[in-house]
């Protein structure tokens, strides 16, 4: 795969100016975290404001962790999201009930766990591979173990976990993911993006 075709999602957005800068850089997707325990959590009210000027062909992804069905439906009704990303222990039945394209994030320690998730979430748009950690659900800055990813997975996968400007080219060269998802690697502090880091991250991928 040509690294120039790697799709990029920048996650944990909380500010309009960071979203706009990401759009100017050419990212494919913006992630909003709807999880009160996260330092990057956004309310529905804030989400409505910061996504107001997102143009066509930039996907809005709602990131959720073991949410109530009613809360997911509320987000779908209130925010123009293109994708749902489930980051907890949600079942395949739960994820598919909303008739919305979804990504299932997993935190595997073995190749068998990755293949099992691909089989279970057969109708997911993609599987997201993130680092197992007791520190939190994503955005930990801990690097994923690329060596456990099976070859020739039948489903597109998104690589996450500790990606930054220094390791992103090595990651995509070694793993050949469909897309990459970056959060803490482009931040000044949780939820506040560093525009220089954002630029360097994109330049490392696309030149």
Swiss-Prot record:
Keywords: Amino-acid biosynthesis, Aromatic amino acid biosynthesis, Isomerase, Tryptophan biosynthesis
Pfam family, one: PRAI
Pathway membership, UniProt: Amino-acid biosynthesis; L-tryptophan biosynthesis; L-tryptophan from chorismate: step 3/5
Domain of life: Bacteria
One example GO MF annotation: phosphoribosylanthranilate isomerase activity
The EC number(s) this enzyme carries: 5.3.1.24
Catalytic activity: N-(5-phospho-beta-D-ribosyl)anthranilate = 1-(2-carboxyphenylamino)-1-deoxy-D-ribulose 5-phosphate
Example GO biological process: L-tryptophan biosynthetic process
Entries under InterPro entries matching the protein: Aldolase_TIM, PRAI_dom, RibuloseP-bd_barrel, TrpF_fam
Signal peptide extent: none
Family of the protein in this entry: Belongs to the TrpF family.
Protein's name according to its UniProt entry: N-(5'-phosphoribosyl)anthranilate isomerase
């Amino acid at each position: 795969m040509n690294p120039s075709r790697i799709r990029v999602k920048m996650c944990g957005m909380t500010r309009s100016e960071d979203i706009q800068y990401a759009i100017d850089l050419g990212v494919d997707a913006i992630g909003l975290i709807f999880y009160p325990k996260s330092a990057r959590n956004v309310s529905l009210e804030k989400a409505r404001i910061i996504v107001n000027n997102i143009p066509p062909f930039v996907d809005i992804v709602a990131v959720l962790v073991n949410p109530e069905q009613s809360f997911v439906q509320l987000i779908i009704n209130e925010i123009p999201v293109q994708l749902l990303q489930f980051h907890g222990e949600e079942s395949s039945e739960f994820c598919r009930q909303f008739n919305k394209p979804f990504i299932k994030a997993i935190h595997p320690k073995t190749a068998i766990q990755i293949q099992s998730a691909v089989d279970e979430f057969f109708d997911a748009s993609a599987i997201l591979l993130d680092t197992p950690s007791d520190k939190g659900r994503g955005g930990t800055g801990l690097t994923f173990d690329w060596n456990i990813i099976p070859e020739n997975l039948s489903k597109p996968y998104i690589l996450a976990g500790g990606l930054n400007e220094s390791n992103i080219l090595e990651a995509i060269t070694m793993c050949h993911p469909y897309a990459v998802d970056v959060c803490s690697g482009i931040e000044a502090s949780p939820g506040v993006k560093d525009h220089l880091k954002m630029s360097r991250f994109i330049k490392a991928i696309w030149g």
